[in-house]
Structure formats: structure tokens, C-alpha cells
Amino acid sequence: CYIRLDQEYSTGKSIETDLKNMMIQWKIPRSMMVVDSDGLGSYLESYLNGIKEFHGGNRPINPEYDNLKSECAFKLAELINNRQIRIICTEAQRERIMEELSVLKQDHIDADTRKKGIISKENMKDILGHSPDYLDMLIMAMLFRIKPIPKRPKAKLGQI
């Protein structure tokens, strides 16, 4: 996982332009780009056809989770615990990511009958003193790990 674009504040238009340039420069297909449908990314899908919108409150793939965001967060935790993810970033980004990962906690840990969920973003903000933007990004990236992109069947020679 690379953090290729990192800005403190961006307008919707600058995000669109930066994403287009990044996809061209790094040859990232639109099908491998995910944006937060609840944030500034909510309008991007209409301008960048084919990108994935992340709706964290949507129904999870696996019904043992509260919602899609929780399922992705648990997948992130699994990959981290199994040392199966690497993030290429600056030292400052690393420090912030470590801080934000510290607030990735399971909610309702005592309840045996409840679905698995994570503490709310508001609780995370209260603990951190800022929005967990890097954590959100990492959680959204797990969409591709829990929901693989369907592979198109390859056409055989002579067939259309």
C-alpha cells in the first residue's frame, strides 16, 4: 500500500484533477480506485466513471458484522496482526497512522449476541482530537480484500 497523494485540505475539483493525474501516472485502473461516498468523494463517481464508492454504512458481505465499514476494519486488523500488509509512507505519516490505528477498537466487546462492530468515528475523533483520515483510507482499501473484483472470462481465439 502506497500513500501517493496526501493533502491537508482539498477542494472537490482539485481532488478530481489529482486523482486523474495519479491514475495516469501510476497506471491505476478506475476499477481499483475507491472513494468515500460520505465525504468529498460522494460526487466523484459521476466524473470518474468506474471508480468504487465506499458506503461504510451499507450491509456487510458477511452477516456477522454490523456494516461494511466494520467488516473492512476487521479485515485490516487481520492483515496487520498477520503482518500481511505494508504501507509505504513518510515518517510523519507513519506516526499518524500508528496513532490512528490505536483507536481501531471493537465495539460491544462484552456482548456475545451482537454483530461485530467498531467504535464510532465520533469516539475516535474524541480520543485523537482529529479525524482518523489515514485509518479511513486503510479501511476503505480493504473493500478490495473482502470483495474481490469479478474476473471477466477470457475470450477464446476465434470467439467474439
Regions found by a protein language model. Give the residues of each.
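Acidic two-metal-ion nuclease catalytic site recognized across multiple nuclease folds
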Residues: 5-9, 106-160
